[in-house]
Amino acid sequence: MLEVETAFIIHSTNYDQIFNVIDQLIISEGYIAKKNGIQIIHDTYFDTKDEILKKNEIALRIREIDEQVTKITLKKLKNTTKNYSERIEIEDTYTKEMLNQIILKINSYLNLNIFNDHLKYYNIDPKLTLKNLGFKIIQTRQTKRKIVNAISKSCNHTAFEFVFDTTTYNFDKNKNVTNIELEIELKLSNNIAVLDNFVRKLKINQPLVKFWPYNKLLTGKVIEMLLYKDELKENKDYDEKKILTLSGLEKIELFIKSKSIKKN
């Protein structure tokens, strides 16, 4: 499936204020805002030893939701615009069949056959399976996710999913850092113009949020690098609760942009 989404960093811990802003935004476009619960998510990302997935803009993830459901996910960047990104996504509950599908897709993307006889490594523990296949863990994080759906009045289906993520990136030596993010995901493909409009309104009218066109995997890797270079300073770039400040976000974005310029 094609995942179309955008993201903003939230500058406030006043959730009532943020929820009210999003409620009004949803209503202004003719949708019904409906809260859809809270999830606790644990994500673990993997790559090969030589990081071949990263080099090909592919992400491999194991996601545990509320300690009840475990999903395996593969994403590959397809396209980016000024307001959103498009990724090809394969995601489902972790099973032998899903593992097979994802490994075959990785081989297809890379035009390689580097994982032969992969099913013989299958284990009910997905992380152990991927390690046995030669993958390494490159990032772990925990997210508290609050979900608000934008419901279409005409068909009563979810047109957009708004999620408020409080995400803590876990690094060695207890160097954990948190950011608060709003993601908007398109659920009905004929509403792309409305997604653009949501983004435009938030960019222009909302000082509480900062447009953030960088995925969590990249954001976390840059945070990790800056922490170990001692370039993110406590009480300046992150507060006493380890939540990133605007100063910290600007350092992260500057680093990403500088690397992008060099690459181009």
Where on the chain are the PLM-derived regions?
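Phosphate-end processing signature that detects enzymes handling 5′-triphosphorylated RNA
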Residues: 1-264
